[in-house]
């Protein structure tokens, strides 16, 4: 083994296996691009993003950690969300939850 080397199992690694997902259409109604990171609580995203927020409570983008999705002004796109796991407590972001989901 080389110091710092990462050894992984062979084959594909399935992200978020067994978790509930949701595909939802999102439109940027603002005049500036909006970027949402992989672990941001989607329910609390920028108010210029138009979508059914109630359906997204407790969910985040179903993309690899560290990635993001960018919504250009006037753009609509469908994204896939995945439920948070673990204790399901959300703190920070825009302060709309600040506790258990």
Curated annotation (Swiss-Prot):
Supply the Pfam families for this chain. Answer: Urease_beta
Where does it live in the cell? Cytoplasm
Organism (species):
Nitrosococcus oceani (strain ATCC 19707 / BCRC 17464 / JCM 30415 / NCIMB 11848 / C-107)
In the Enzyme Commission scheme, what number(s) does this protein have? 3.5.1.5
Reactions mediated catalytically: urea + 2 H2O + H(+) = hydrogencarbonate + 2 NH4(+)
Query: Belongs to which family?
Result: Belongs to the urease beta subunit family.
> Hydrolase: is it a keyword of this entry?
yes
The record's section on InterPro entries has: Urease_beta-like (IPR002019), Urease_betasu_sf (IPR036461), Urease_subunit (IPR050069)
So which domain of life are we looking at?
Bacteria
Protein name per its UniProtKB record: Urease subunit beta
Q: Which UniProt keywords apply?
A: Cytoplasm, Hydrolase
CDD domains cross-referenced by the UniProt entry: Urease_beta
Pathway connected to this protein: Nitrogen metabolism; urea degradation; CO(2) and NH(3) from urea (urease route): step 1/1
NCBIfam families, A to Z: PRK13203.1, urease_beta
**Gene Ontology biological-process annotations:** urea catabolic process
Question: Could you give the subunit structure recorded for this chain?
Answer: Heterotrimer of UreA (gamma), UreB (beta) and UreC (alpha) subunits. Three heterotrimers associate to form the active enzyme.
Q: Which GO molecular-function terms appear in the entry?
A: urease activity
Record's GO cellular component, any one?
urease complex
């Amino acid at each position: 083994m080389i110091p710092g080397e990462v050894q992984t199992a062979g084959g594909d690694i399935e992200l978020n296996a067994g978790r509930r997902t949701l595909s939802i259409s999102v439109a940027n109604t603002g005049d500036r691009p909006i970027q949402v990171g992989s672990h941001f609580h989607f329910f609390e995203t920028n108010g210029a993003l138009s979508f059914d927020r109630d359906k997204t409570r407790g969910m985040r983008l179903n993309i690899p950690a560290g990635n993001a999705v960018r919504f250009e002004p006037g753009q609509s796109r469908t994204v896939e969300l995945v439920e948070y796991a673990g204790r399901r407590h959300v703190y920070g972001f825009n302060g709309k939850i600040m506790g258990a989901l």
